[in-house]
């Protein structure tokens, strides 16, 4: 008996989504947006710890029907939600292949957020947490500012403008048949 890997065939099959699957992803994205755009801004505030922000996110996800588990087709990339990082905590080193890091709950659980790190006034809070409905994920990194829009420093405004430009270019490249790895490169 000779065994042969079928990973490539499975990856090709998973790359093409049916309308049924696309609807699951759209529903997941709509619920994810509701949590980040509507629910969280009403519930989080400066003075909260990263962990408390993460817990607030988790409560909202479950209340909206999310499963809480993110499964991705890569080694070591099955995780529970993600990160809430206040200010420079987001540059904390991590093994995760994503835009954000954080100290986490403890060295053994480098996710969610740290209970001792507080979100200060006039500071950034970055949340890189996914959403899953029935096995279909959406992922989004959301940045909040704890102050009036006119108090955002120039360097942060410029960095945001670059991020928006990258987002728009990437979105324009995402068309049926496009290979995400080619866009990522």
List the predicted regions and their residue ranges.
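Active-site neighborhoods and metal-handling regions in enzymes and metal-associated proteins
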Residues: 1-185
């Amino acid at each position: 008996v000779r065994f042969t890997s079928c990973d490539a065939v499975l990856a090709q099959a998973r790359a093409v989504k049916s309308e049924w699957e696309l609807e699951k992803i759209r529903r997941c994205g709509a619920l994810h947006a509701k949590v980040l755009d509507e629910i969280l801004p009403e519930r989080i505030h400066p003075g909260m710890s990263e962990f408390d922000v993460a817990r607030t996110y988790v409560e909202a996800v479950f209340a909206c029907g999310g499963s809480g588990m993110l499964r991705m087709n890569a080694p070591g990339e099955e995780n529970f939600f993600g990160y809430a990082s206040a200010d420079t905590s987001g540059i904390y080193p991590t093994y995760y292949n994503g835009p954000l890091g954080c100290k986490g709950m403890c060295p053994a659980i480098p996710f969610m957020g740290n209970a001792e790190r507080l979100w200060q006034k006039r500071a950034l809070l970055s949340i890189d947490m996914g959403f899953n409905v029935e096995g279909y994920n959406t992922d989004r990194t959301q940045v909040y500012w704890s102050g009036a829009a006119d108090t955002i420093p120039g360097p942060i405004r410029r960095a945001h403008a670059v991020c928006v430009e990258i987002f728009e270019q990437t979105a324009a490249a995402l068309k049926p048949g496009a290979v995400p790895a080619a866009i990522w490169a």
